[in-house]
Amino acid sequence: MYEDVPIYVKDFLSYMQNIKNRSKATIHEYYYDLRNALRFLKLYKLDKIKLDKINSEMLNETDIANLDIEFIKSITLQDLYEYLNYLSNNCSDRATTRSRKVAALKSFFNYLTFKQKLLDKNPTVELETPKLSKRLPKYLTLDESLALLHSIDGKFQKRDFCIITLFLNCGLRLSELVSINMQDIKDNVLTVIGKGDKERSIYLNKACQDAIAAYIAVRPKDGLKDRDALFISERGTRIGRRTVEVMVKKYIEEAGLDPKKYSPLKLRHT
């Protein structure tokens, strides 16, 4: 499978499927999006074909299986903008589709730069996502929610997974989440103090119960400056709002989603 793309693309697809646990549908989208982008870039950069001369038939006939990593290293931000310009002018892609293709490129180049260490410079760092209509929904789909959860890793994986699980399932405000104390959870019910100091009770489904149990099992016990707080920062204090905002943005980007579109506020409406 995927024999018509270079080995580093195959490796990326394998990484996204086996390590990041992306769905088969998402892997196929990555494959088609990256294959199309590399075919265009070969025609445009190597074959020196003018933008207005490139058509779908030429793309379909272009062989990229032997493109070496040196070609990838030569790709610039401007080359990628030319590709987006081509999509906008020659394809029927809507902004949402182009946005998905940008996300695929960002994930691919992030992988080559930070995981494989094959690139010294990532040309997608400043690549902007096509602006989406304000009428588009601002909540995550099921696949996007799963992608976000699968992106969580690192030293605080259990804590961060628990935080995002609660955001996705409980409709918590950021202020409510950081204010949760250990004693606020009893018999699978979470009690929070919301706007206007109004107390409300939230039933915790199994996903939340499992995430909380997994986090509490590794939650720091020694040297805490706030023993009541459920979520503890690296310094042993109650986790702050800004820390959560930065953390959520980080995982949104790693999931290939648009951080300008999603935030803790948007997660609570999912």
Question: What are the roles of these predicted feature ranges?
Answer:
Residues M1-T270:
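Conserved catalytic core of the tyrosine transesterase superfamily
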